[in-house]
Amino acid sequence: MKKTTSPAPSGSIQATPSSSDKRDLPADLASDLNAIDPGRRRALLAGLGAAGGAAAAGLMGPGRAMADPANLPPNVAEWSQVLGPGVDAFPYGMPSKYEKTVVRRYVEWLTATPESSINFTPLYALDGIVTPNGLCFERHHGGAAEVIPEDYRLMINGLVDRPLIFTLDDLKRFPPVSRFHFLECAANGGMEWRGAQLNGVQFTHGMVHCVQYTGVSLRRLLEEAGVKPKAKWLMVEGGDSAGMNRTLPLDKALDDCMIAYSMNGERLRTEQGYPARLVVPGFEGNMWVKWIRRIEVGDGAYMAREETSKYTDLMPDGRSRRFTWEMDCKSVITSPCPELPCRKKGPQVIKGLAWSGRGKIARVDVTVDGGRNWHQARLEDPIMSKCLTRFYLDGWEWNGDTAYLQSRAIDETGYVQPEMAALQAVRGVNSVYHNNAIQTWRINPTGEVENVRLA
């Protein structure tokens, strides 16, 4: 392993895990949790990691260790002795039945209703950088809208020369563009601000996914409408029952935004905005308005609900931190993690993901001793702007001792992923959004992995 010359972060190697039945949650989340029966509350908190752990067990745990000798060499396995399903069995291909535990997961007590809530991508179970469409996390404010494609319309109005209305077929007549980008909810990791809370990478970092989007450049649509010189902002509005809307700077809209109608080569899923959504590379997911139905061009910010009372952070001095669109450089180790413990001593490959809303990932460093020594990870091609990047630390020998794993990403602008203490020094402990702090996993001598906060 190659050591870097960058300094190790200060601080003693003392874990501060939260108890399973007493967690320091943000006030709005704590009130929901406190309304639950104490016994069920303890089971939910303790079981968050177990949900992913059950999935991990199906992948690499006792089920794999207890192989049927009749199917092992030199015997002929049972599946080699019978005809399998024909080509007419699955008109739309599905995952293997043995991967049924790899699913998006939903935390019941997180919100009052699932129609205005979120579920989480199983990052621990994925390889490469592309998220399968069926595993991309969902965030809804009024449930997923079932839009009839023939009735779909996108309006552009306001400070334009020619107000326009596009059908879905109209959008598809424009020259298509395809790009890979990550989409991250601004609240990804938000529950970890005050200490280690959720024991599983699916729950600490699972509000992110990465796909290839195909659609039409938003710039081309605005050029068709003819934007007036005094225009500076857009108000983008969705067709869901919540009427989700956000303000978007015109400069960003003219840069790299698109109206997407496909993801990973197929039409958008309903929960991802079918038949069309806004793609805002590098910006927080709340701005990627789904089921987009209207774009109003104006000369001032619209101060929508989702950018004033919501998606803002209260600073220690009483001011509000808002219009924080860009997602900062971030990384997380996805193996080992609470869902994927170390089963054997010896050589290990540490795997993870890094991303930045500012551009490409330039480097990722990994420590196994809580920051005393850092080692430069191997980045896997392709490395693309505003896209997930896969990293590996090869050849780490785990001898069974307690280890503290962290990753630290650096993007092409030179921005370095911070420790939580550095974020809290500036933003206090009341934040929910834009937590890009370094994550710590503790590997215990048993091989089990847990989410901890170093003192």
Located regions from the model:
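N-terminal export signals
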Residues: I36, R42-A67
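Residue-level detector of intrinsically disordered/flexible regions characterized by low predicted structural confidence
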Residues: T4-T5, A15, D24, P62, ...
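Generic alpha-helical secondary-structure signal
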Residues: P38, A46-G47, L221, T367
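Short, cationic motifs built from Arg/Lys/His that form the positively charged side of catalytic pockets
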Residues: R40-R41, R277
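N-terminal secretory signal peptides
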Residues: M1-G39, A57, M66
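Structured, non-membrane catalytic/scaffold regions adjacent to prosthetic-group chemistry
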Residues: D68-A455
